[in-house]
Amino acid sequence: MADNAKSLTVSIVTPDGQVYENKTPMLIVRTIDGELGILPNHIPVIASLAIDEVRIKQLESDQEDDEIAVNGGFVEFSNNTATIVADSAERQNDIDVARAENARKRAETRIQNAQQKHDDAELARAQVALRRAMNRLNVARH
């Protein structure tokens, strides 16, 4: 059993339900202002998350880190509990690489079409879709 002073609890939830919950010695997230590492007893924080991977260190050093593709949302940390509320999130082993690759190709096509039509709103949506697809692919391939 992990010593509470040496670990924190991480919970990741989406509109579809809980994706992840575990204890960790360190959580690493990318906020809109840059990377943030959270250790036990960190000061309370709330931050908006970028579309990127969340890395959760394992209590046992010989185990691989858990990696989760998170597509926006926020992290709130207090009392040694980190709660990530994400628009969507997928654990590394749950990512369908073929589906993510198809999403990447569709997004690239949408970007080209939006640029040709000078449709700024569609271009912005397509760029977000591309970032989400690339995030899923990057996490799946680690």
Swiss-Prot record:
Quick one: a GO cellular component term? proton-transporting ATP synthase complex
Q: Which keywords label this protein? A: ATP synthesis, Cell membrane, CF(1), Hydrogen ion transport, Ion transport, Membrane, Transport
Q: Where in the cell is it found?
A: Cell membrane
Q: Hey, which family's this protein in? A: Belongs to the ATPase epsilon chain family.
Tell me which CDD domains the record gives: F1-ATPase_delta
Protein name per its UniProtKB record: ATP synthase epsilon chain
Annotated S-S bridges: none
Record's NCBIfam families? ATP_synt_epsi (TIGR01216), PRK00571.1-3 (NF001846)
In the bilayer, the protein is annotated as: Peripheral membrane protein
* InterPro entries reported for this sequence: ATP_F1_dsu/esu_C_sf, ATP_synth_F1_dsu/esu, ATP_synth_F1_dsu/esu_N, ATP_synth_F1_esu_C, ATPsynth_dsu/esu_N
MF terms per GO, please? ATP binding; proton-transporting ATP synthase activity, rotational mechanism
Q: What does this protein do?
A: Produces ATP from ADP in the presence of a proton gradient across the membrane.
How this chain assembles, per its entry, is: F-type ATPases have 2 components, CF(1) - the catalytic core - and CF(0) - the membrane proton channel. CF(1) has five subunits: alpha(3), beta(3), gamma(1), delta(1), epsilon(1). CF(0) has three main subunits: a, b and c.
